[in-house]
Amino acid sequence: MARKKEFKYRGYTFEELINMSLEDLSKLLPSRQRRSLKRGLTPEQKKLLRKIRLAKKGKYKKPIRTHSRDMVILPEMVGMMIYVHNGKEFVPVQIREEMIGHYIGEFALTRKRVQHGSPGVGATRSSMFVAIK
């Protein structure tokens, strides 16, 4: 029977990450995320964190929706369902331990994969001689 491997981020367990201050945690993050946190959180990001903390306590009942795609995923967000705007609609994102240190926007894709239809008449040389439906 295979045991689930314990999650570690840069050698620290999830419990250790939760107990860390934001300053200590930022030292573990990649440079882009570290600089983003060092500049300080925007008012929208602070509002999102406030909603997440209220939801964890059970005081915020509505689904958490955000346009703030540039928010770095912190350990206190793990386990939450956040609806992230992709430019058209809000995409549900379940925050997992493996996502710590990434941006929320990375998990709500802004572009859809192209699904081309069948080519029209005259699209290729051989299709000129195909009977029209």
Swiss-Prot record:
GO terms, molecular function: rRNA binding; structural constituent of ribosome
HAMAP family hit by this protein: Ribosomal_uS19 (MF_00531)
Keyword Flavoprotein: no
Name the record gives this protein: Small ribosomal subunit protein uS19
Keywords associated with the record: Ribonucleoprotein, Ribosomal protein, RNA-binding, rRNA-binding
Gene3D superfamilies in UniProt: 30s Ribosomal Protein S19, Chain A
Record organism: Thermococcus sibiricus (strain DSM 12597 / MM 739)
UniProt GO cellular component terms: cytosolic small ribosomal subunit
Annotated GO biological process: ribosomal small subunit assembly; translation
Family: Belongs to the universal ribosomal protein uS19 family.
Role played: Protein S19 forms a complex with S13 that binds strongly to the 16S ribosomal RNA.
Domain of life: Archaea
UniProt KW Nuclease keyword: no
PANTHER family noted in UniProt: RIBOSOMAL PROTEIN S19P FAMILY MEMBER, SMALL RIBOSOMAL SUBUNIT PROTEIN US19
